[in-house]
C-alpha cells in the first residue's frame, strides 16, 4: 500500500497544501501537512470531489452494461503441395445490456416533452386568437371614441364660437353703454364743477361787498361821531394841548382801524383759498360726505376729517428747467447729461433720433454736444480748452519797438557735398572732423560776426534719415543756402532740400562747391537745378548762384555778401526788449546737467532765471551757454543758446516762450501733455478697425523688436523713422521703447521682456545696465554713424525672412528600353543626354514634353552595379519609386531643390 504525506500529495496533483487540507476536511478527514494519506482516503477524497462537482457516477448504479467476449481457435488450412498450415482464428463479441427502467424513463420523458410542446402550442394559439380579438375590439372602440370625440369637439367649438360672439356683442354693447355713461357723468361733473365755481365766486364777491359796506358804514359812523363831539374835543384840546390832540386821533381812528383790520383778514382768507389746488370731483364728494357724517353727534362738529387720499398736494413741474450748459472741446456723454440735469438715457435717445449712436461713457465733440443740448432746449456756452494757454501766452510784455536783426541761414544739401566744411571755413574752426564718419548728425546752430554784420547759421544733416531735421531747419530760417557739389550735381537730398525751402517760403541761395576739382562742372549743376525751378539770376531767375571751394576758401566772402544782400532785401526785424520767444532746434539728456535744449531766440531777450514754456515741458533757466560752451546771461534775437533747467526733454521744433508765472506754466504743460495723450489714444482707437484685417495676419509676420537710445531728440526721431520705413510685408520693425540719454537697467529689462535688441546711438550703458545685459544675454550694439546702424538692422531683418527655394535641373535622360525586375518592377534603360543623373534625387517623368509623374529616383545602375551618379553620354538603368508605367521614348528629368538666401530690397 502506497502512502504519501499531504504535502507530497499536494505537490503531485498541483494543489496548494492549505486548499488540499480544506478539501480533506470537507471529505471528513482532518489531516495536517505532515500526515500520511492512504489509498482508501484518496478514493474517498476523489468521490467527495466528484459529488461536489456534480459527477455522481462514482457511487451510482450503472444503467448500461457492456460485455466483451473473445474466443481463440486453430484452423488447419491446405497450403498446397500436400502441405497444410495452421491459422489462429480469434472471434470477438460485444454485447450491451441496458436497464429496462432507463428505457422507460426516457420514453416517459419524451412523451412528457411532446405533451408539453403540444400544450404550449395550443396555449400560444389561444393567446394569439385572444390578442387578435382584443385588438379588433380595441380598434373598434377607438374608432367609436374618435367619432364621439370629433362630434363633441365640433359641438364644443360651435358653443365656444357662439359664446365668443355673444361675449363680443355684450362687451361691445357694455363698452358703448359705459362710454355713454362716462360721457354723461363727465358732462354732469363738469356742469357741477362750473356751478360750484360760479357759486363760490358769487359768495366771494358778496363777502367782499359786505366787508366794504361794513367798513364804509363804520367809517361814516366814526365821522358822524367826530362831528358830534367836535365842540367837546375842541375844549379838551385847549386844556391838554398836543397830548390831547394825539389822544383824539387815537380815539377817533379806533373804529376805522377795526373795520380796516376785519376787511384785511377777509381779503387774506380769500387769497389763501385761491392759492389752494382745486380738488377733484371725487375728493370734493368725499369731503362733503365727511362733513355730513361729522355733524351727527355732539362734541365732534368742527373737527377735520381724516383724508381719504394719501397723495400729496405737490405737483412736479412738467416743463424742463433751462440750463446754461458749458461745453468744452470734448465732453463725456454722462457729464453732458449731468450738466443738463437729465438722465443719460434721455441724451442717448435724442442722439438716436438725430441719427447718431453713442454710449454713456463715449466722448463726443463740441459740435455734436451743442446740437444735442440745443435740441433739448438748453442754452449752450462754448468754452475753449486752451483758454488758460491763450491767457498765459497773451500775458507777455512784447510791446517794445522792432529793430533790425541778424538773418538766420540754414545750410542744406546732399550728404558729403561740403555743408559743414563751408561753415567751418566761415567760423575758422574744424567742426567737421569732430562729427562721426565725417557727416553731420545734429542741427548745429552757430552765429558768426562778419565785417558787415552778424549771421546765424544752422547746419542740417544731409543723410536721408534726417528729413524731419531739415524740415525744422527750413521752418526756423530766413534764408536757405543750398550747397551742391560741382562734380556730383543734383542728388536726392538736394531735391528734398529744394522742396523744404519752397514749402517754408524762404529764398534760396545756391553755393556750387568743389569748383577746384578737375571734374567740376558748374554749368551742369545750373541745368539740373533749372529742372526744379531753381533759375540763376543771369538766366532771368530769382536765385543767386555763388561758386565756392570750402577746402580752399575760394569766394567764401562772396557767399557772405550774397547772404547779407538777401537779408537787406527781406528787411528782417524783431523786438529786442521784452519777454523772449523762440524755437527748440535740438534737445538732449545730459547725464550731469539733465535736459538740455538748443533754442534759437526769434524775438525778445532771453535772460538767465526766466520761466520758459517749451511744448509739454517747462522750467526756470538755470544756466545758458553759447555754441562755444561759454556761460552767458542773456541772448537776443537770432542768437542760438543752450538752456538748462527744463522739467524734461522737449521735442525738437517746439515753440519756446517766456511766461510770468511758473504755476500757470506747469498747468499749461500738463494740459498739453494730456491733450497729446488723448490724441494719441484716439488715433490708436481709430486705427483698430482700419487695421483689423492686417492684424489678422500679424501672427504670420516676423517682428524685430528694438529699444532705441540716442544722444539727442532729433537723432531718435530720424533713426526711428528710418527703421520703421524698413518694415516689409514679411518682417516688421517694432520700436518698443526709445529715448534720449544713456542706456539704463530699465531699458535692459524692457528689452528682455519684449525679446528686443538694444541700439545705442552715441550713448553707452552704465555699469548696472552692463551687468543686466550680461545676465539677460540681451543683444546690445553701439553706433556712431547712422547708415551703419540702418545697414545692420537691414541685415538682421534679412536673416528673419522665410527662406526661398528654387528647383534647379541637373540632368536629363531618355528612355531607350524597359526591363522588368522582380524586385523593383519596371526598369528604364536610359541614355543620359544632358547634365548628370544622381541617385535619390527628385525626378519628373515627361511624355511628349508633358509631366506625367513626379517622384524620386530609387535605383540607379550601370552594368548591374549600383552607382551614385551617371554622367552625360553614358547608359544606365533607372528605377522610379512607386511608378511602373515607364515607356520607351519618355524623358526622365532630375532636379535639385536649392535654397536661395533672401535679402531686403
Curated annotation (Swiss-Prot):
Q: Which GO terms describe its cellular component?
A: cytosol
List every stretch annotated G4.
Answer: 513-516
Which stretches make up the tr-type G domain? 404-573
Map out region (G5) in residue numbers. Answer: 549-551
Chief location: cytoplasm
The record's family statement is: Belongs to the TRAFAC class translation factor GTPase superfamily. Classic translation factor GTPase family. IF-2 subfamily.
Function statement: One of the essential components for the initiation of protein synthesis. Protects formylmethionyl-tRNA from spontaneous hydrolysis and promotes its binding to the 30S ribosomal subunits. Also involved in the hydrolysis of GTP during the formation of the 70S ribosomal complex.
**Stated name of the protein:** Translation initiation factor IF-2
Species per Swiss-Prot/TrEMBL record = Vibrio parahaemolyticus serotype O3:K6 (strain RIMD 2210633)
